[in-house]
């Protein structure tokens, strides 16, 4: 929580500095910085709307095709198409009609569609079964490729492909 709060600039460090891509984040405009950020927490949040709109929330001007491509890229498309109304399936606030893994896949699709420069994943696979974890892992691989990513995890499988690993 402390690391996420510092990286997200909910507060600044009392000593030292935090560099992202070699730049001290204290001197970056807060709105600009946060608009380039995607944060995925252990407890995903879905809005009371359709799956299509929940993914589109990542980038409001996205076309249906772009939303579907994002879902395909993180392995969410298959389960979405098995739902009674596909992408038009209504989900309750917090996504209670979906499993934890399905909610996380929808959130990954949203994050991929938003295309943030900086990604923070906090225990993104902690509450899911092994089979769903494999799907989510593939989604994570696509999500972190080519961007600065901070992955906070207890499972080695979640961080095995990271360039640098810090153990705290």
What are these regions (language model features)?
Residues 16-23, 33:
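Conserved ABC transporter NBD signature motif
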Residues 2-8, 35-43, 51-54, 70-76, ...:
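ABC-family ATPase nucleotide-binding domain "signature/switch" substructure
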Residues 56-64, 78, 114:
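ABC-type ATPase nucleotide-binding domains, specifically the catalytic core motifs of the NBD
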Residues 12:
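Post-Walker A helix-loop "phosphate-sensing" segment adjacent to the P-loop in P-loop NTPases
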């Amino acid at each position: 929580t402390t690391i996420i709060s510092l990286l997200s600039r909910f507060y600044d460090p009392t000593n030292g500095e935090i560099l992202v891509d070699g730049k001290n984040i204290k001197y970056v405009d807060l709105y600009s910085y946060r608009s380039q950020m995607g944060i995925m927490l252990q407890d995903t949040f879905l809005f009371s709307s359709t799956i299509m709109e929940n993914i589109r929330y990542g980038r409001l001007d996205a076309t249906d095709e772009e939303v579907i491509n994002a879902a395909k890229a993180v392995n969410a498309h298959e389960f979405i198409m098995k739902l009674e109304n596909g992408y038009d399936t209504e989900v309750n606030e917090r996504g209670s009609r979906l499993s934890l893994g399905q909610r996380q896949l929808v959130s990954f699709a949203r994050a991929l569609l938003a295309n943030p420069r900086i990604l923070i994943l906090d225990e993104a696979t902690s509450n899911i079964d092994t089979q769903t974890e494999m799907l989510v892992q593939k989604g994570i691989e696509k999500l972190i490729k080519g961007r600065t990513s901070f992955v906070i995890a207890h499972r080695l499988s979640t961080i095995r492909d990271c360039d640098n690993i810090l153990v705290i």
